[in-house]
């Protein structure tokens, strides 16, 4: 049995576990897993769609440039959220673990394990490309923030309401007026 055939046979199971583990990194993972409506759940649907496309590209042994669009979709979402870089990108490398779980447990697929080195290398390249995209997204966020600070708009968006500041000051000093 060839590796590509084994991956194709286990495609649905591998994708299901990979998407589940990725969505588990969110505090609202239950909602992300249940709702398939792209309008009610754009994050969950976009991540599932992106990971599915990435897996299919790995199966097709596609050129690295073909990975850019689905990687960009997933990484942009995770780059603007409160994840550390390692948390944001760990799901790409977890695919290795997911594949190993399905192939190491079956006697018929155990002979394929030595063939996983090539797949692991392609997954590593995919993860490195994801890191490049993540770094570019974070840099863009910081550049936007600096531009906002320079323009003075940050004063409007980050400043507390004057009446809220007065209430806080009263609480701290213990005065009622």
Question: What role is predicted for each listed range?
Answer:
Residues 1-71, 107-177:
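Core of compact, soluble alpha-helical bundle domains
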Residues 74, 91-95, 127:
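Long, contiguous hydrophobic alpha-helical segments, chiefly transmembrane helices and signal peptides
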């Amino acid at each position: 049995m060839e590796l590509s055939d084994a991956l194709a046979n286990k495609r649905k199971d591998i994708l299901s576990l990979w998407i589940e583990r990725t969505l588990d990194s969110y505090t609202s993972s239950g909602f992300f897993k249940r709702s398939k409506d792209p309008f009610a759940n754009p994050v969950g649907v976009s991540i599932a769609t992106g990971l599915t496309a990435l897996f299919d590209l790995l199966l097709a042994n596609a050129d690295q440039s073909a990975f850019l669009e689905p990687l960009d979709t997933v990484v942009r979402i995770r780059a603007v959220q409160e994840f550390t870089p390692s948390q944001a990108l760990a799901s790409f490398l977890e695919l290795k673990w997911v594949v190993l779980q399905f192939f190491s447990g079956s006697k018929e697929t155990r002979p394929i394990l030595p063939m996983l080195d090539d797949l692991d290398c392609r997954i590593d390249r995919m993860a490195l490309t994801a890191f490049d995209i993540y770094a570019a997204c974070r840099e863009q966020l910081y550049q936007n923030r600096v531009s906002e600070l320079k323009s003075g708009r940050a004063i409007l968006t980050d400043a507390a309401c004057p009446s809220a500041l007065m209430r806080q000051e009263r609480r701290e000093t213990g005065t009622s007026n």
